[in-house]
Amino acid sequence: MFILRLFSPAFGEIEADESQIFSFPEGLPGFSHLKKFLLIRHRDNSPFFFLIAIDEPEIYFILIEPSRLLADYHVELSCEQQGLLHLSEETPVLSLNIVRIPPEAKEMIINLKAPVVFNLQEKIARQIILDADYPVRYPIPLSKVKEKADAGTK
């Protein structure tokens, strides 16, 4: 197992092992040139993660586990999408959603239409556009997020 060390302007010196590195064969929309990302959890039991571009660590995304906030949100992948991610019934999967927190905002915006799905076994991931009628911009009050995050640490 190798250890990756990189410096990110937002996070400082980061040390991570290879289990936290994911390949994005097509990159992310708008960042197709970036193929390798580091996925780190904000802190234990936090619903937040950071997805940091290895080749350009100044580029990162904030992601969240939507199930921690929205009980009725479910990611259903088509057979084609499952194939692109090399998924089977037994494959461990993590589905996260990109969030945007505008400066001085009282709410954050979650993209529910296009989750980032991680194949935890093969270490590949893709942002998938769901067929379901979920919004691209779903607002959630930051107070609700803080309440749920605090509940997860107890």
From Swiss-Prot:
Pfam families for this protein: FliW (PF02623)
UniProt-listed GO biological process terms: bacterial-type flagellum assembly; regulation of translation
Alphabetic keyword roster: Bacterial flagellum biogenesis, Chaperone, Cytoplasm, Translation regulation
Cysteine disulfide partners in this protein: none
The protein's role, per its UniProt record: Acts as an anti-CsrA protein, binds CsrA and prevents it from repressing translation of its target genes, one of which is flagellin. Binds to flagellin and participates in the assembly of the flagellum.
Record family assignment: Belongs to the FliW family.
Name of the protein described by the UniProt record: Flagellar assembly factor FliW
Organism (species): Carboxydothermus hydrogenoformans (strain ATCC BAA-161 / DSM 6008 / Z-2901)
Organism taxonomic ancestry: Bacteria, Bacillati, Bacillota, Clostridia, Thermoanaerobacterales
Record gene name: fliW
